[in-house]
Design a protein with these regions (language model features):
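Short glycine-rich anion-binding loops that position phosphate/pyrophosphate groups of nucleotides
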Residues: 32-38, 81, 132-136, 166, ...
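PLP-dependent aminotransferase-like
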Residues: 8, 74, 83, 87-144
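Active-site pre-lysine segment of PLP-dependent enzymes
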Residues: 63, 122-124, 139-159, 163-193
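N-terminal "arm"/small-domain region of PLP-dependent enzymes with the aminotransferase-like
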Residues: 1-56, 63-66
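Hydrophobic/aromatic beta-strand patches that form the interior of the parallel beta-sheet core
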Residues: 25-29, 76, 97, 160, ...
């Protein structure tokens, strides 16, 4: 296994060395970033030379909160889902299950996490990590199932749902369940679509 803070993929030349050149051109999907930017992206006046100031981050979080229908105090902007997953995993630790097959980092974010089939994930204690829709197969967990999993979390257990691809159907999001007492952490992405 790679060190948790040093590897995220995206090395197309390494993949070609390992698996052979195959039929070119290769399509690199490792970042999840749409290579076809929205029209007129160059016309946006953004300062790419420095990090955003606290007020700008608070503004981003407020806009995201409005978009997702949650209170701004429940939003924390991070520089990508990958780092967010790893940071949260380092903070909560403990026993955990992650849905397999699934996104590789879900299995690495909490050292003691164990792979579990999607239909059996709620049969065990500990925190639960899954994506909805799932990455890589697109499997969708029914809202009722996720709400049941959330209701069964308590103590130090969390439901961690990676909603990086939830923009395909906003009704999939558990954002309406976010609250001060919910043992729920959602991960959203601005870079997928």
């Amino acid at each position: 296994m790679s060190e948790p803070w040093t590897w995220h993929g995206g090395d197309l030349s390494a993949a070609k060395r390992r698996f052979g050149p195959g039929d070119d051109p290769w399509i690199d999907l490792s970042t999840g970033i749409n290579p076809n930017a929205w029209p007129d992206a160059e016309s946006v006046d953004i300062d790419w030379r420095r990090l955003p100031e606290r007020g700008a981050i608070a503004g981003l979080e407020a806009v995201a909160a409005t978009c997702f229908g949650v209170a701004a105090r429940h939003v924390c902007a991070v520089p990508g889902t990958e780092i967010g997953l790893r940071l949260v995993g380092a903070l909560i630790g403990g026993e955990a299950r992650y849905a397999a097959p699934g996104y590789r980092t879900h299995g690495e974010m909490i050292p003691a996490a164990m792979a579990t089939g999607p239909d059996a994930i709620g049969r065990h204690g500990g925190s639960i990590i899954l994506a909805n829709p799932n990455n890589p197969d697109g499997r969708i967990a029914p809202s009722a199932t996720l709400r049941d999993l959330l209701a069964s979390r308590g103590g130090t257990d969390w439901l961690l749902v990676d909603e990086a691809f939830a923009d395909v159907d906003p009704a999939l999001s558990l954002a309406p369940a976010v609250g001060d007492d919910a043992r729920l952490i959602l991960f959203r992405s601005f870079g997928k679509f």
